[in-house]
């Protein structure tokens, strides 16, 4: 037994070995944060759960687990065969003794990945209607205040202010500075727009933009949170991001898109000289129209003053007075007809009421009631007499069949010692005591002899 025990102690269980290896993996500092690139394989999206897939290159493959909380932070839709960058740690799945990569974050690989993210987000937001033409709002003709979201330094804000002041100096320009490049730019842009949204009643239009740059430089204007905030603004939005050849999702969500900051300022403001010239033309046309109207009205007034009506104004109401007299006569005749008709109806109703007078009806009902009461009384008396005769007859029949009546005629009946009526000699034996019941009393006797008689 001792030798067997010593042999067992040299061997590890499978669980012990897997646990030991897991500890080695988890304590290795080089395996706690690994930056990995590869191609997605066996990727099947599991809605609302953890994701299990593989990363591979042309020679090897490794299993990957990405828990739900980490996968929810992924900003694109992974697809089978897509090349990605993944960060995470390497450990073992102790229950199966296999090692796997636990992913914490995932990004598409390379510049092509940015275009893929752009395409996926554009398709998603388009389905929601964020770029629909029917949601586009017209720009105000004469804005009082214009909000601008861009970098505090640079040519963008300078070009906007110079152009706006030249075209329409009445408009007030307020800058809400924001970062327009880098990892924190999206949050900065959203924060600036939210400040404007909180004072939406003060501003007539919003300009958001920046100068040119690479796709990576312009990427904050493609972030979903920025695009959604542009769409949600309560005032019209002009987007001017990059050069004319650049198109961002922010441009698509805005109400208008301008190729340059200068073009954005021109769209937001009217050209004052042109406006003044147009106002002058409108003023001239208005004065001409007013003079023409006054002239026409003056001619009409002169004709009216010279008309015979103005010289003999009583003619205006002579015919009306005649019409009033005619209507009065018609009204009087109509009233007479109505009164006569209603009088006839009243007379007819009076006759009908007299014919159906309540006192006559009441008298008739009283007579009917008296007759019915007498009939009921006679019927009850007749039925009572019939019932009394039937009762007397039943009493007589009952008396005729009474045992006492039978005893009175000289008959008797016999009972045994227990009080049972004796109906047959089969109930008795010699020596039994019996009781004879007569009409005026009872007698007690004893059986001396029994003789049977057979009746045919």
UniProtKB/Swiss-Prot annotation:
A GO cellular component annotation in the UniProt record: cytoplasm
Protein name in UniProt: Exodeoxyribonuclease 7 large subunit
CDD domains: ExoVII_LU_OBF
The protein's role, per its UniProt record: Bidirectionally degrades single-stranded DNA into large acid-insoluble oligonucleotides, which are then degraded further into small acid-soluble oligonucleotides.
A single GO BP: DNA catabolic process
Main localization category: cytoplasm
Catalysed conversion reaction: Exonucleolytic cleavage in either 5'- to 3'- or 3'- to 5'-direction to yield nucleoside 5'-phosphates
Broad enzyme group: hydrolase
Annotated GO MF terms: exodeoxyribonuclease VII activity; nucleic acid binding
Record keywords, A-Z: Cytoplasm, Exonuclease, Hydrolase, Nuclease
């Amino acid at each position: 037994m001792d030798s067997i025990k010593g042999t067992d102690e040299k061997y590890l269980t499978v669980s012990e070995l897997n646990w030991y290896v897991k500890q080695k993996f988890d304590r290795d500092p080089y395996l706690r944060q690994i930056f990995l690139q590869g191609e997605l394989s066996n990727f099947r999206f599991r809605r609302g759960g953890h994701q299990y897939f593989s990363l591979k290159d042309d020679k090897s493959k490794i299993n990957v687990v990405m828990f739900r909380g980490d996968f929810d932070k992924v900003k694109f839709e992974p697809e089978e065969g897509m090349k990605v960058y993944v960060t995470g740690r390497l450990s073992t799945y102790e229950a199966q003794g296999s090692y796997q990569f636990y992913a914490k974050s995932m990004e598409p690989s390379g510049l092509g990945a940015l275009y893929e993210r752009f395409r996926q987000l554009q398709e998603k937001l388009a389905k929601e209607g964020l770029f629909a033409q029917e949601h586009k709002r017209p720009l105000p003709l004469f804005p009082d205040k214009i909000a601008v979201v861009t970098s505090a330094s640079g040519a963008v804000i300078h070009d906007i202010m110079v152009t706006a002041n030249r075209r329409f100096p009445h408009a007030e320009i307020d800058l809400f500075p924001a970062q327009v490049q880098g990892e924190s730019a999206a949050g900065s842009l959203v924060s600036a727009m939210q400040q404007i949204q909180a004072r939406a009643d003060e501003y007539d239009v919003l300009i958001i933009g920046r100068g040119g740059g690479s796709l990576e430089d312009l990427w904050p204007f493609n972030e979903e949170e920025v695009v959604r905030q542009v769409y949600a603004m309560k005032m019209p939005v002009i987007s001017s991001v990059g050069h004319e050849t650049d198109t961002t999702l922010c441009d698509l969500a805005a109400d208008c898109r301008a190729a340059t900051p200068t073009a954005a300022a021109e769209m937001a403001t009217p050209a004052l000289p042109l406006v003044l010239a147009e106002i002058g033309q409108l003023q001239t046309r208005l004065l001409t129209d007013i003079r023409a109207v006054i002239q026409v009205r003056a001619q009409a007034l002169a004709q009216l003053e010279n008309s015979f009506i103005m010289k003999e104004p009583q003619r205006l109401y002579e015919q009306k007075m005649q019409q009033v007299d005619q209507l009065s006569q018609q009204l009087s005749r109509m009233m007479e007809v109505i009164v006569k008709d209603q009088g006839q109806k009243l007379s007819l109703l009076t006759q009908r009421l007299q014919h159906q007078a309540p006192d006559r009806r009441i008298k008739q009902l009283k007579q009917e009631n008296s007759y019915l009461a007498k009939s009921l009384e006679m019927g009850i008396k007749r039925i009572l007499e019939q019932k009394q005769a039937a009762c007397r007859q039943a009493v007589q029949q009952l008396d005729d069949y009474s045992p006492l009546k039978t005893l009175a005629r000289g008959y008797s009946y016999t009972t045994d010692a227990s009080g049972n009526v004796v109906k047959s000699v089969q109930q008795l034996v010699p020596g039994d005591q019996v009781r004879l019941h007569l009409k005026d009393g009872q007698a007690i006797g004893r059986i001396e002899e029994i003789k049977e008689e057979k009746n045919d």
